Amino acid sequence: TPQLFRIKQFDCALFDEASQILEPQALGLLCAKTEKGESAIGKFVFIGDHKQLPAVVLSPEAQTAVRDPQLNDIGLLDTADSLFERLHRLQMRSGDGRFVGLLNRQGRMHPDIADFVNRKFYGGELRPVPLPHQKETALPAPGADPLEQFAASTRLGFIDIVPDAPPQNNKANEAEADMVARLVQALIALYGRNGRKIEPAESVGIIVPFRSQIACVRSRLQQAGIRRAEQITVDTVECYQGSQRDFIIFSTTISRPYQLDVLSSVQRIGGADIDRKLNVAITRARRAFFMVGNRKILEGS
C-alpha cells in the first residue's frame, strides 16, 4: 500500500504465479515510490510458467489483441497476456537469456508421468528431484480385476469410452462418470491390497470441463459408496491450477466434435504448439494420471 512505502523501501519483490498476473494488476507495485520520489522496490523477480494457464480474461480475443506496431515491438501482442509472458517473449526474441532462468527440478510428478510433458512442452529440460514417491515401482496386482491391473501397470493412461448413443446433455457424460467412479474404487482396492490405504478425499482429484459433469461425477462417486466421496475435489482444470493430488482423473466428457475447442488452450510458444490446459491437467498428478474419453472424437483435435 502507499502508506507502507512511506516508511519502508524493499530491495526485492517476488511475483509468484506471475504468468497469471496481468500488467494492470502489477502496475501499482512496479510504479511504487517513496516520499522522496525514489523507487520503493529495488528489483522484481517474476516466478511463473507461461506454458500453463494464463489469467482468466472474459473479453474475446478480438477485443484483447493488440495491433499497434509500436506496441508489438515491445512484445505487447495481447492485453490478456501477463507481463511475465511479454518480458519472456522479448528476452527470447533478443537472443539474450541473461535475465531468464529455468527451475528444472520438479518434485511432483513421477518420471513416467513427467516424460510426456517434458518431451511435448518443456524440451526435455525437466529433471526429477527425486523424492521418494518419484522412485516408486509399480504395485503388484495378482488376481485383480482388469481395471485394477490397468491402474497398477500404468502411470499415464487413457480409457476409451464409447457410449451406445451420444448423451442428450452434451455437457454431462454418465458413461465417463461411471468409469471415473470405478477407477477410484480400483485405486482404493489396489493400494489396500498392498497394505497402503489411501484416502480418496486427499489423494484423488477429478478434472472435468463442465459444471454439469461435476454433478454427474459426484453422484456416481456417492452411488459407488466411496468413502468421503463428497470431499473429493471435482472441478475444472482452471480451478486445479496450483494444486496437486496423488492421482488425477481427467474426464474429457465431450461427445461431439464441435466441443473439442473447450478442452484445449493451444498457444504457439518458442516454435512449438503448447496445449496449456492439457499441460496443467497432467502436471497436477504425483503418482498417476488417467484420461477418460471418446478416443475417436479426441483424435480430431
Residue positions per predicted region:
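Conserved helicase motor core of SF1/SF2 NTP-dependent helicases
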Residues: 1-301
